[in-house]
Amino acid sequence: MFGATVGGAVILSTNILSTQGYLQTARNAFYDQDYKTVYQATFGMELDDSESDGLIKAKSEVIFKIQRRYDSYRTNLKMGRKIEALDALLQGIATYDFINADAEKYGVMAEVEAVKADILNTLEAEYNVDETKARELINNGDALSYTTELYDIISGN
């Protein structure tokens, strides 16, 4: 019985220390504006978003949702996947609309707006697509015509 109690205490303390280590990693990453690392370090954790660590997780998740679209654009571009790269930028605009209320709730509008600005600047500079045109493309309900329009943009038509 004593062995089981000691074993249980060791496992419990190991889990607590492990969780604290992940939370410290998340805190450091948040202050370094590395939202992907925060997301990875806190993935699966049930944290109260009214407390410090939960708030860091919630803020980072909101920012990371749009940031990963821009990161996806850069990754696809490096891999020569031009259509997927353009689609990632457009999905970033759609993501912005989806996360807007949460960004306001958690006080991260400035960070989200900065990523949106990067996306819009890239759309304009690389594809000659402004926000109005981007929203028209996003709202195209037909997958085939959407893809055709992306091909036309890539080819300069």
Each predicted region: which residue ranges?
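Structural signature of alpha-solenoid helical repeat junctions
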Residues: L17, E51-S52, K57, V62-K65, ...
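Non-cytosolic head/periplasmic domains of membrane-anchored proteins
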Residues: Y70-N157
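Extracytoplasmic/periplasmic/luminal assembly and interaction segments
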Residues: K36-D87
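Generic serine detector
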Residues: S13, S18, S50-S52, S60, ...
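Gram-positive cell-envelope targeting signals
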Residues: M1-I56
